[in-house]
Structure formats: C-alpha cells, structure tokens
Amino acid sequence: MVILQQGDYVWMDLRSGQEFDVPIGAVVKLCDSGQIQVVDDEGNEHWISPQNATHIKPMHPTSVTGMMEDMIQHLGDLNEAGILRNLLIRYRDHLIYTYTGSILVAVNPYQLLSIYSPEHIRQYTNKKIGEMPPHIFAIADNCYFNMKRNSRDQCCIISGESGAGKTESTKLILQFLAAISGQHSWIEQQVLEATPILEAFGNAKTIRNDNSSRFGKYIDIHFNKRGAIEGARIEQYLLEKSRVCRQAPDERNYHVFYCMLEGMSEEQKKKLGLGQATDYNYLAMGNCITCEGREDSQEYANIRSAMKVLMFTDTENWEISKLLAAILHLGNLQYKDRTFENLDACEVLFSTALATAASLLEVNPPDLMNCLTSRTLITRGETVSTPLSREQALDVRDAFVKGIYGRLFVWIVDKINAAIYKPPSQEVKNPRRSIGLLDIFGFENFAVNSFEQLCINFANEHLQQFFVRHVFKLEQEEYDLESIDWLHIEFTDNQDALDMIANKPMNIISLIDEESKFPKGTDTTMLHKLNSQHRLNSNYIPPKYNHETQFGINHFAGVVYYESQG
C-alpha cells in the first residue's frame, strides 16, 4: 500500500502497450477525496481511483530533482522512465549533456548554445571526467589525454537517430582536438575544411533533419609524439546513391546540386546548359527546392574555398561541375515506347538534355542513346544486343547516374585523403598515435524503406550490440567473476536480430544476395524465400496477405517495414 501526500512525486504507469510507452513522472495535487489527482510532467491532469492506485509508485528523490550529471552513479530510478525524466529536466534547463558511466548522452537542442567558445575549450582542457559538467569537450579531452598518457590509440563512437546531432558532435570534437593539439598548422586547417566538402556531396535535407548525413564516415586523426595533429584519413561507407534519382516528399537531393545552381555565375551555368533547380526532375521530385536556414549560394562559396585548401585544382573543380550537370540533364531525358522484332523496346527522344549530357560526358549522342536503351551480352566472342523496355531503360539510366555520383564521391574522398594523409614515420622513437571518430547515420524508419535503410539499420544494430556488451554484459560478467552479490539489470539484447539479418546460415542478407544472382530471381521470389526461412522468428514479421510486398524486422529501436519491390 502506498501512502501519499500532497506534493509527493510519483511514477504513473498508464501504459497502453504501445511502442516506447513508459511510466511518466507526476506530482500529487489532491489525495483526500477518495481519488488521487495528479499532474504529469507534460501538464496533464489525471484522476486515479483507489482501485487503480497500484499504477502509482513513489519516485526516488534523485528523480524528483532530475539533475543528475551521471545517471549510473547517482540516479536512484535507474530504468527507462528515470533516465528519460532526468534527461527531460536537464534539457528544459538547457543542459543538453548527461553522463551514463563512460557514455555521454547528448540531446539535440535545435538552437545555438554559447557553450563551445575558446574559453570553454580552455576550461575542459586537462580535466578528468566529472571535474566539470558533462560536455562533448570533456569526452574529446579524455580521448586526447588517454592517448598521450597511455600511448594507445583511441576511438569515439557517435551514435543516434537521424537528426540527433551526430555530425555536429563530430565537428565539435575536431574543433577541440585542433585547438588543444598545440599548434595551428596548415594540416589542421585542411582536416577541418574537409567537413564542408563532405557535407555538400554527402548530406541532404530529409523530413527529420535539414543536414542529414547520407553516408557513414570514420575519421582517423593522426598525432605525432608531441601530440600535434600531423594528418588524418577518412573512410566512407554506404553512400545513399538512390537519393540522386529520387527523393521522398519534402526532401532534397544532395546539397551540392542546389549550391551549384545558386552559386555559379551565369556564364558558368550557360557553359553547362544549366537553369534553375525547378527545371530538373532529379531536384524537383520532392517538391522541396529550398531549405530554411541554408544559403545555398554562400554554401557554394564555402565549398569552393574549402576545395582550394584541400588542393583541388580549377580543372578538377570544372570536371566535377560537368559531371554534376550531366547527371541533371540525364534525369530530364524523355523516352518513347516502341516495338522491335515483337519485343518491348524504347527510344530516347532527341532533345537539348540528351545533346548536353553527351557533350558533358564527352561521348556521341547516338552512342549514349544506344547504351541507355539496350543490353549487350558477349558470350564466346559473340555479341548479342537486346532492346530494353521503357521501364527497364529508366532503371538503367538511374543506375548509370548512381554509378557516376558514387564514383565521384569516392574520388573526392580519395582526393581529400591525398591532401591530409601523411605516411607514418619509420622511426621507432616517433610512434604515431590516432583518435578515431565514427560518425554513422542513425536508425531510419521512413514511409518507404528500401535495401539502403536495411543496411543502415543493420549497422545501427551492431552499434547497439557494442553498447549493450560494454554497458551491461561485460560489467555483469565482471561482477559474477568477482562473486559480488548484486541485482542484475534487465536489458534487451539484440543479438538474435543481428543473427537473423547477417550472422546465421540462410540469413536475410545472404538470401537477398543469393536471389539477386539467379537469372530468374525476382522481388517476389526473394520475399517468398525470406518468409519461408524466417516467418517463425520473433524478430521477423511476414506479410499478412499474399499480395503484400513488405516484410518487417523488429529492430532494437522499433519495428521497420521494408519494401521488397524496386
């Protein structure tokens, strides 16, 4: 039996069984009228009858104040509800950083906060975790200090949903490391200037985030014996190439296209046959040309300036512009159905878009038309050409465009690495140390989820398992080894989902790969195999009806339905 008084704080558990439903904090306003009146943290009033009093539990004093800087050490209600309330109260007080052991939790404030100045960098330099309030600079300083003291490489994993602020956190860590490494060199400037280039070609506006990273990156920052930055190397993963050809409503293509059209001179645009963003199918598909808060023309100037710092020549910049323009013109090609020897075929209508695209790619228009409307096979020295239907030709055109952009992105990353990477010294007395920053796209769940979302969410499942292992599994194993009597923490382990997706025999990835190699493999046969193999797995959700084309996966962050068609 719980005895309550006016002003007591309680947990109110009115969960309806919906996803992410947790108890909510509340304060007792009235409890002497047979019913209990409470007001929850969102300002809503509730009347609780004596029969439902079991839904109310007293709140631990540490959760009442909700200002615990380290939740592992000081939070009494160490559960999902307690953690969320602590983060909420701190967030309302503009305290966006909170520790949970060695992990820093950051809540995106969606506004500029004056907590990243040179003075803040000075305050967090050479400080142990806990000496100062939680901050991204404290994590960066801890990595740097451990690298120098222990002469061991460090790694910082930045994880979270799309729009959580991962890219900004990466930039802040880079800013801190550049400031404290002891010298403001040209190489430090080059490392920092790589960011606007990568964002231009790899980021886009989505419904959740105006500057969403559509690729993953791992930045390895190299330090010499004195602790000064002497170079870096960038690895890129899983660029979302499909965005070049199609975007969801209220989303944009990659920033660089809009920046180029707004920032180029009229003379340059004329040479490339370019007009306005609304003129191009690849840019107008999402009905979102502008992005609030972004000045595309100014961003273009920033990109060009950064490219000069990273040693891109004027010739290379112009060749990049030609490829980007060619992509836009290819997206405006018009196709017409026709029949060839009783086979469905098509032709590309001759237009300015075709002529300009061919000119920019430095090929003859007829050759380009032929490549986009037929399939050529060479077997035993014999060449066989088969016409493509209009639908097939559109897919080929889009695949061609995605290939161009994907290879261009890889080349740009390689060009940046050529400027910022310095081979390690062969002298044993001067060992190189590094701090790695992993900035990878967050968990995604859109109206339509494709294979790219599956890959992204699979990567996030691995990160979640990393955190589960280090926060829960290893800690509890250590307690068990030392025979320490303690209350085991219940947690959700996502290892079964990982096994189903990619680890166990006949996993989802292997089945998709296998079906894509069969000459007669289709989206329908692939879905049938997935259903047959995994329908009894609790982490797999098969279609309810035969005509449905989606299957679901119960990820750690929620259920996501993937479209098998396309």
UniProtKB/Swiss-Prot annotation:
Taken from the UniProt entry, a GO cellular component term is: synapse
Q: Where in the cell is it found?
A: Cytoplasm; Cytoplasm, Cell cortex; Cytoplasm, Cytoskeleton; Synapse
Q: Which GO terms describe its molecular function?
A: actin filament binding; ATP binding; microfilament motor activity
Q: Which domain of life is it from?
A: Eukaryota
Residue stretches making up the Myosin motor domain:
67-566
A single GO BP: sensory perception of sound
Q: Which family does it belong to?
A: Belongs to the TRAFAC class myosin-kinesin ATPase superfamily. Myosin family.
Q: How does it assemble?
A: Might homodimerize in a two headed molecule through the formation of a coiled-coil rod. Identified in a complex with USH1C and USH1G. Interacts with MYRIP. Interacts with RPE65. Interacts with CIB2. May interact with CALM. Interacts with WHRN. Interacts with PLEKHB1 (via PH domain). Interacts with PCDH15. Interacts with TWF2. Interacts with USH1G. Interacts with MYH9. Interacts (via MyTH4-FERM domains) with cytoplasmic regions of ADGRV1 and USH2A. Interacts with PDZD7 (via MyTH4-FERM domains). Interacts with CALML4.
Return the protein name: Unconventional myosin-VIIa
According to its UniProt entry, this protein's organism is Sus scrofa
Q: Which gene encodes it?
A: MYO7A
